[in-house]
C-alpha cells in the first residue's frame, strides 16, 4: 500500500516538473534544464522514500547524494549539462555548524543520561502530582517542553518515553494518554530555542539568528501554544485522567524512588555546570560572534575531560546515522539550489503572494505546516531555507527575520500532525511499538492534526499582530 501511494505521488511530481521548469525562463536562462530536472527528481524521490518509510531515511539521503555525484562525475565528464554538482561544491554545501552542534549536544546528553537524571525527573513529576493523573500529565508536559528547549526534543522523547510507558502501566491507563501530550509538548517546547528542534538548528545556522533571537521571538508563542495544548489534551483524554487507577500512591512512590534515583551525583553536578556554561555561550552568541557549534563542542570536550568518561563509549552514543543524514541532505538540497530549482519554487510563492509581505508570511507558515505533516520537517526545512533567502531579497519592505520565524513555526508545529511529521514523533512511536503499544497512522492524525491546526492558527495571529 505504501509503495503504491508513493509511486502515484512520484509519477504526479514527474508530470508536474516540466510545468515548473517552463516557468523558470524569467529567473535564470543560463542554467541548463538537465541538471535542474535531475536534481529535482532526486530530491522528490528521496522525499518519497522518507515520507513513506520505504527505506531508512539515512540510506535514502545517501542514495540521493551518491546518485547526484555519480552522474556528475560520469555523464558530466562527457556532457557538461550533466555536471549537477562537483565534489568540492558538495563539501561546501554541507553546513558543518549544524553537524557539530548536534554532535556536541549528543555527547553532553549521553553523559547526562548515565547519571539517571531523566528517570529521576519522571519520578519527581509523579511525586509532585501526588497521584493525580491529570496533574501528572500537566507536569510531564511542562518538564518535557523545558527539557526540549534546553536539550532537543528528539533526545528528550528518547529518554522520557520508556519511563512514561512504565508509569502509565502502573497507573493502568493507556500509555498514549501520557505519550501524546509529551510528544506535542516536546515539539512545542523545542520551538522556543535554537537547539530545541532540528529545523531551528538548520534555520539558525543559515540565517545567523542567535539563541537569544529564537528565545525572545518564538518563546512567547511556544508558551501560548503550550497552554492551549494543555486544554486540548484534557479534551481528548479526560476520561482516562478521571479514572481512579491506583489507590496505593505511597507504595508506588516508594517503588519509583527506589528504581529512579540519581546514580552519580558528582557527575550530574559536572554535567549541569558544563550545560549551564554552554547555554550562557548560546546567549552570548551576538557579543562573542561564536557559532553555536563551537559552544556545544567545547562543552562536550570539557565534560569528556573532567568526567573521565571513556571516549569510545561516548562516541558510540553519538547518533551517526542522523549526522550522516544531515550531511547527505545538505548535498541534495545544495544541488537543487545550484541548478535553479529552489528559485523556481520561490518564484511560485512570490507570484501567489503578489509580493505582499502579509500574504507571504501566511503562505510560508501554512505551506511549511502542511508539508511538514507530509514529510519529516527536517528535509523540508533544509529545502525551504534557500527559498526563504530568495523571498527576503525580492519581497519589498519585509522584515528579513519574520519569514524565518514563519518557517520555524510552520515546520515545528506542522510536524505535530502526523507520525512522520517530526523525528520525535517517529522516535516515540517506535519505542511504544516495541513495548507493545503501536499506534496507527490515522489514530495519530485524529489528535495530532487538530493540535497542529490550532498551533498554526495561533502562530499566524502571533506573527501578524507582533510584527
Explain the meaning of each model-derived region.
Residues 2-23, 173-176, 180, 192-195, ...:
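Juxtamembrane and boundary regions of transmembrane helices in multi-pass small-molecule transporters
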Residues 48-55, 143-152, 183-195, 284-287, ...:
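Transmembrane alpha-helix interface/packing and boundary motifs in multi-pass membrane proteins
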Residues 82-174, 320-394, 400:
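Membrane-embedded alpha-helical segments and adjacent helix-loop junctions characteristic
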Amino acid at each position: 500500500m505504501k509503495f503504491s501511494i508513493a509511486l502515484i505521488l512520484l509519477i504526479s511530481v514527474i508530470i508536474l516538473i516540466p510545468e515548473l521548469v517552463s516557468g523558470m525562463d524569467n529567473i535564470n536562462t543560463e542554467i541548463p534544464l538537465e541538471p535542474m530536472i535531475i536534481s529535482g527528481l532526486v530530491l522528490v524521490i528521496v522525499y518519497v522514500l522518507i515520507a513513506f518509510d520505504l527505506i531508512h531515511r539515512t540510506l535514502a539521503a545517501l542514495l540521493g547524494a551518491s546518485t547526484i555525484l555519480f552522474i556528475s562525475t560520469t555523464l558530466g565528464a562527457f556532457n557538461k549539462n550533466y555536471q549537477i554538482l562537483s565534489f568540492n561544491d558538495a563539501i561546501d554545501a554541507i553546513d558543518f555548524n549544524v553537524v557539530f552542534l548536534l554532535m556536541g549536544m549528543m555527547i553532553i546528553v549521553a553523559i547526562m543520561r548515565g547519571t539517571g537524571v531523566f528517570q529521576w525527573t519522571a519520578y519527581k513529576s509523579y511525586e509532585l502530582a501526588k497521584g493525580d493523573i491529570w496533574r501528572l500529565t500537566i507536569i510531564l508536559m511542562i518538564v518535557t517542553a523545558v527539557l526540549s528547549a534546553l536539550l532537543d526534543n528528539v533526545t528528550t522523547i528518547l529518554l522520557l518515553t520508556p519511563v512514561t510507558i512504565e508509569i502509565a502501566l502502573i497507573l493502568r491507563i493507556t500509555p498514549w494518554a501520557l505519550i501524546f501530550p509529551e510528544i506535542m509538548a516536546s515539539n512545542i517546547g523545542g520551538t522556543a530555542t535554537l537547539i530545541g528542534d532540528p529545523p531551528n538548528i538548520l534555520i539558525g545556522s543559515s540565517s545567523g539568528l542567535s539563541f537569544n533571537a529564537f528565545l525572545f521571538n518564538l518563546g512567547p508563542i511556544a508558551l501560548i501554544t503550550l497552554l492551549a495544548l494543555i486544554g486540548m489534551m484534557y479534551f481528548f483524554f479526560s476520561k482516562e485522567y478521571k479514572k481512579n487507577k491506583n489507590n496505593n500512591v505511597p507504595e508506588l512512590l516508594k517503588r519509583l524512588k527506589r528504581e529512579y534515583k540519581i546514580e552519580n551525583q558528582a557527575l550530574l553536578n559536572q554535567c549541569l555546570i558544563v550545560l549551564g556554561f554552554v547555554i550562557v555561550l548560546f546567549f552570548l552568541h551576538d557579543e562573542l560572534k561564536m557559532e553555536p557549534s563551537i559552544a556545544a563542542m567545547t562543552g562536550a570536550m570539557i565534560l569528556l575531560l573532567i568526567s573521565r568518561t571513556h571516549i569510545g563509549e561516548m562516541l558510540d552514543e553519538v547518533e551517526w546515522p542522523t549526522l550522516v543524514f544531515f550531511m547527505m541532505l545538505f548535498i541534495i538540497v545544495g544541488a537543487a539550489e545550484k541548478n535553479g530549482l529552489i528559485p523556481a519554487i520561490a518564484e511560485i510563492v512570490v507570484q501567489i503572494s503578489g509580493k505582499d509581505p502579509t500574504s507571504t508570511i501566511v503562505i510560508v507558515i501554512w505551506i511549511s505546516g502542511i508539508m511538514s505533516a507530509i514529510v519529516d520537517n527536517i528535509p523540508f526545512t533544509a529545502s525551504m531555507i534557500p527559498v526563504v533567502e530568495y523571498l527576503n531579497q525580492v519581497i519589498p519592505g519585509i522584515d528579513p527575520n519574520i519569514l524565518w520565524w514563519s518557517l520555524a513555526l510552520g515546520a515545528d508545529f506542522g510536524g505535530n500532525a502526523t507520525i512522520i511529521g517530526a523525528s520525535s514523533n517517529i522516535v516515540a512511536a517506535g519505542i511504544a511499538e516495541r513495548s507493545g503499544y503501536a499506534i496507527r497512522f490515522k489514530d495519530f492524525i485524529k489528535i495530532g492534526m487538530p493540535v497542529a491546526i490550532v498551533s498554526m492558527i495561533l502562530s499566524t495571529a502571533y506573527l501578524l499582530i507582533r510584527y
